[in-house]
Each structure stands twice: as structure tokens, then as C-alpha cells.
Amino acid sequence: MNVETPRLEIHIDRIAHNASAVISQCGAQGIRVAAVTKVMQAHPALLRALEGSGCVMLADSRIDNLKRIAEAGLDLPTMLLRAPTPGNAPEAVRWADHTLISSYQTAEALSNAAGMAGVRHKVVMMVDVGDLREGVWPDRAVEEVSRIARLPHLEVAGLGTNLACFGGVIPTREKMEMLVALRDECRSATGHPLELVSGGNSANLPLLASGEMPAGINHLRIGEAIILGRNVLDRSPWPGTRQDTVELVGGIIELQRKPSVPIGRTGQDAFGNTTHFTDRGLRLRAICDLGRQDVAPEAIEPVDPGIEVLGASSDHLIIDVTDAETPVRVGSEVRFLPSYGGLLSASTSSHVRKMATGRP
């Protein structure tokens, strides 16, 4: 049976295995997990893999993805990871149970929207402990939380932070202790319990595994370690997980032996880059029906170790198959393991078919 390419094969059973492994590791140290779905746009196959995994909530950065979670009918609370603009506050209140925020203006808009909807909305105040993405600076946290706690239709559920995303800052015991101490100060200043202390994302797992995670951290937002089974600090395999959870499959549309260096004067390629080539003589090269419109060539790794990705234009992926372990021909399929960035692109591309396999 012929199956269309390009396609993204989502192995539900393998992701479910990873989810159970990672969530069990966290649970052993009293940490609850919000499973992050954004890299795959909250695809139903991913949601099926996460259902019953032990996660306490589902988290995403996009309101549209939270809608998909609601439509799937999963009985889990949701968390909006990216603060909404004031104009999007009503939608945030409608589709999220918790929202991460970092400014009073956003909190005020959420409170107004919650009042209009007749609900009480939970917010988590983000504190920037050094990665320089979102979050109030630590010396302003108590003041900001105290102001927000007075808004009529909000509940400040706790504090959170984010590391190893923009600045690549590695989570440490000291940074986690700072967050716990700030929570305690905010609790004293407001009289609110602020029970949730969300210490970060998959980057916190090595600290957890080392036994150095402070007891006050009770929540993490985990995506890549579950979906791709990677230690995000160095992309090595995370213990107890699989890395073959999602495969990008392309079909070969041309197979020819060609020189390894272009012939003629060269300038920039279609994307404004100047490319350098090494003369390796004649090589057997294949073109797959994938391109940069679907995924960056540097963000995928062939499953066959003898295949090498050479580059891509918008719609053509060029690979060297001279040393392929499995012979290929026009019409053959080539499998690739995507990085986090590669999976993000392929999941977003409407040109890549998504196909679920296996059962949780």
C-alpha cells in the first residue's frame, strides 16, 4: 500500500512510554508535571499518548492549541504558557485554567475578562532568574504579586520561572532556592497560599536526577524530554526514554550519480547563503519531497547512518545515499529523526501529513 509523503509518523505507544517514565521520575520527588503539547500543535495523537500518563495538566503556548485540547475531551486542567495580550485575555480565560503572566497589565485584563465570564481565573507569576525571557525581575516580584493578588477575579496560584530557552541558562539549586524563597516572601506579603512553584521545563530534569532539586519546587512543564526523549542541555538520550518517537518520512523523487561540487560560477543560494562544497568526486545523490518550507535540513538526522543530508531548497531535500545501508530507488522512503526545532516546523507545515501509529 502506498502512503503519501512527506509525512510525520507519530508513535503513540513510544511517547506514552516516555511520558510515564519522565512523570514517574518527577513524581518520586514530589513534583507534578504539566505535559507541554506545543511542539506538535496539540495533535490528537499526542494527546492520546499523554492521557493516563500521570500528568496533572496539559500546557501550550497557543490558544488555538488549547482549543484542540478542549475538543479532544480530556479531563485535565490546561495551562497557557505564553502570556496573552490584553486583547486576547477573554480567549485565554475561556480556554485555559491557568495562565503564566509577567505584568500587572496582563493580570488586570485577565481579571476583567474573568469577571465578564463569571469565573475566577488562576495565574502564575513568572520570575526571571537569569535566562532573560519572560518574567518580572526578582526584586520586584513581591510588589507585583501583591498588586495582582488584590484583583477581584484572579487567584495567584503560585510562581514560576523559565530557563535554558532564550539565554540557555542552566537550572541550578541556587536559582530554584531563589524562586522558593520569593514564593515564601509573596505568601507572607499577601496571605495567599501560592501553592504552585513551577521550576521550569525539561532542562530541570538533570538537576532533579542529581538529587539537588529543592523540596519547595513542586511543578515542572515538560515537553521535549517526553516527546523526543532528550536531555535538553546537551540533546543526549534521557534515561529510560526512547528517541524514535516521531519520524519524518520523505519520498525519493530523483536518484542520480552527480559531481559533489557545482559546475560554474556560484553566488548565493535561494536563501541568501554562500555555500561551500568539498570535492568528493561523483556521488549517488537523491532528492526527497521535503524542503525548507517543511523543515530545516540541519534539523533532521537520517535513520540510516550511511545517508548524509547535504542541504535543501524550498521544496527539495538533497541527500547523499552512496553509503546507504539499505539500497534506494525512486519511490523509496527515507526516514529522519527530527530535532525539537525540526519537529516544530514539520508539525506546523500543512504540507506534511500527520499519521499516528501504535496505541498507548
PLM region spans:
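Generic N-terminal amphipathic, Lys/Arg-enriched alpha-helix
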Residues: 1-10
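Active-site-proximal beta-alpha core segment in soluble small-molecule metabolic enzymes
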Residues: 7, 31-174, 181, 189
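Conserved, mostly hydrophobic/aromatic
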Residues: 15, 38, 69, 125, ...
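N-terminal capping/small domains of soluble enzymes
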Residues: 18-21, 28, 39-52, 65, ...
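Active-site loop ensemble at the mouth of alpha/beta enzyme cores that anchors a bound cofactor
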Residues: 205-288, 294, 301-302
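C-terminal accessory subdomain/extension
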Residues: 259-360
